[in-house]
């Protein structure tokens, strides 16, 4: 398949861009003979990592994604967080948030967010499900945030369209410059002899937005690293599961992590911690008569 040039801009053929995005994401499928050899799902979501990260960014909000959403909430307004996790995107916005709706596929993640929001005096409306399937249920908001979800969306055009339609003021997307699991590629080669994909990328998403006629701004920056894991053993276990390796290979995984430069005293997630990320924002096209609703604070 001919690969479209992500830098081609609005003239790039949207159909080709969308097909390339789908094909690249499909390339991340793990061969059945590898997944069949283990009992645990490799698509693990380390909930404690999400919780620690949400707590850290809530304590000291910073970065372009926060700044764009914060500015759009002047005057205060409602927030819809798509793929909320434990709340790293929306919790820092609570001081200017009049109503919070949170969408996630994982009930455990919604519970983590609700616990933290309610501790701050906000009762969120929780919408379990996949975006954009639950877009109608989630409704509209002044600001829509969506952090580190786009690489899960094979059908990216309706995903982006629904974000735009849901926002009265602004959509703010945050994503890593390249697929977050790229950092595991050397380990897949080491343990399975498997060459993993390198795409898609944030540049490709920007090209898709342009081809859709959406004028988006973007800013690249490095997200500060932090102590995402409580211990090196926890990082080792999550990495082992992600690599479809049995428990008796934990020592081998630990050795590989150390060989890669991971400091056991400061275990960080191999996904997006300390990595270059891109904040992307564009105007929503939700109805101008959107009511921000009664405060749920």
Task: Tell me the role of every PLM-derived stretch.
Residues 2-74, 77-85, 170-197:
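Conserved class I S-adenosyl-L-methionine
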Residues 86-133:
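Class I SAM-dependent methyltransferase SAM/SAH-binding core
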Residues 143-156:
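A short SAM/SAH-binding and catalytic strip from SAM-dependent methyltransferases
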Residues 157-172:
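A short glycine-rich, Lys/Arg-flanked "PGG" loop and its adjoining helix->strand segment in the class I
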Residues 198-213:
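Short alpha-helix
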Residues 215-297:
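Conserved Class I S-adenosyl-L-methionine
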